[in-house]
């Protein structure tokens, strides 16, 4: 049995037919072709599938697509401007060498984008530690990710002095 759902993904309205068991990550990847949302553990542990649903960071492997009917969903593909201009966070990830293999990067970008947009104090080391503990990276050791987060917070909140 399928259910009709409407998702507003990266500003575009999509009508989908999904089963009751279709995870949001599968709807994004398989039905909409948005493969930037990676699947790692599929148990909500690693954070690679993090997207924003109505502004909140969620593990798309744990959320059913049907639960998101009418919701605004933002994926990593929806971060850059239409002309390809990067966000301050994307630029900081590049400049601070905050990625290596890149598999976890979309999840970190979405996690940190949500935190920045909600005004969370990610420049506070303790808060950033708690936030980053929710996503896993096996390559970077988190140093570049921490620098990128602080740089993006400074640039977004304090002007271009980053």
PLM region spans:
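Signature of N-terminal electron-transfer/Fe-S-associated modules in redox systems
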Residues: 1-162
